[in-house]
Amino acid sequence: MALPPGPKQSSAYQTLAWTLRAPPFLESSRREFGDVFTVNLGIVEPVVVVSDPDLVKKVFTGDANILRAGAGNKVLRPILGGRSILLLDGPEHLRERKLMLPQFHGERMEAFTQLMRDITNRAIDGWQVGAEIKLQSAFQEITLDIILRALFGLDEESRRTTELREALHRMTRWASGPLSQITMSREANNKPGLWWMVKPSIDATDRLIYAHIAERRNAKDLALRDDILSLLLQAEDENGKGLSDRELRDELMTLLIAGHETTTTAMAWAYERLLRQPEDMQRLQAEARGEDRDEGWTDAVIHEAMRRRPPIPMVARSLSEPWTLREEDGPLPAGTIVAPSIWLIHHREDIYPEPEAFRPERWLGVKPDTYRWLPFGGGIRRCVGASFALLEMREVLRTVAARTELVLADPSSSRERISRRAIVLVPRHGTRAILKSRQPAAQSEPAAVAA
């Protein structure tokens, strides 16, 4: 069984290129080899990268017992744990998904809206007029507070909240290092590496999460609480079985890490462009302040930011048996990783003319296509928290736009380069801005979002 052709450089070179400069590496490979090519990242199985939407549809709608996303995500196991919804396959994954999905839809989301606004307003109140703000860091503080409150219902001034926030910050700082992804891959494949550098932070986070679980299981008011942990503790499958402490720990860690890092990054990339395109910023502010009729500009900004700079460059499926992607290639061997590339699909010129241009108007009156806009993955593996993330981005961006006037810290910079934080593509300098002015929250409550 032959693999599609791909770069001929050594696996060490390809691994380094993927780690340090993933988008250029993917783009140059597509230019040379087309929409399907094989890369060798050394410490994982061969990776067949796919950037044709029709083939991506075939991957996302294929037999999940053959195209195993959990096995394809094993690089995440050292942090998220083996019972994370991202690491499970087959019936175990479907069971977990059914238990978790209801917590992130419908009336549950409406209940989080005011929480998101309140936390964002408190953060803005702490920003100093005339001072430089790294918006990546500022948004991270906001999204971390939101997810902590949503998951645990914690008082933001409590000792346990502070400890959990500090432990997560230590993990994030480690993930900012250039070797974090390689370290995670080596640990996931049981190879020696530098895992000892981050393990104490993970252990500290685990102790706090397990303490929350134990405390909440015994809470007399459990049935009255509306935080996600309490709701998950009460959730049962069709056999009347709930989630174990280990399952809860892994799902909570997944929501903590995935629930704020990618959202933070998408908003930082949105502002990286908005600060350089004043007309687009003014339109967002006018909509947020209720000065213009809501035509969906905020959502268009979010869709375009996540298209142009998707936080995750590709997703993965591991083949449990030989499987045919393209007839001309024949079946791919079992163990091969098939990887739809979000980055490459989002930068196809035949789908998105001038793909590097930031043009939110692409999305006005347009619903994103399932296989051409996929920052949340697709198929039965689409992110369970996608609705939460989109609501959070909408509320945070509108609140910030309604209350603040921000300008670039370095007006001479035309764009910000990409850096890597574990598996996430972030603005290299954190989207540096100066706060020129700030309106009081009472005078600038963001306009209601159209349903």
Question: Can you name each region flagged by the protein language model?
Answer:
Residues T262-M281, Q285-E287, S387-T404:
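Cytochrome P450 catalytic-core helices
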Residues R30-R31, T120, E166-R170, R289-R293, ...:
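Cytochrome P450 proximal C-terminal region
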Residues M1-P4, R68-L76, E92, R108-T265:
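Cytochrome P450 heme-thiolate monooxygenase catalytic core
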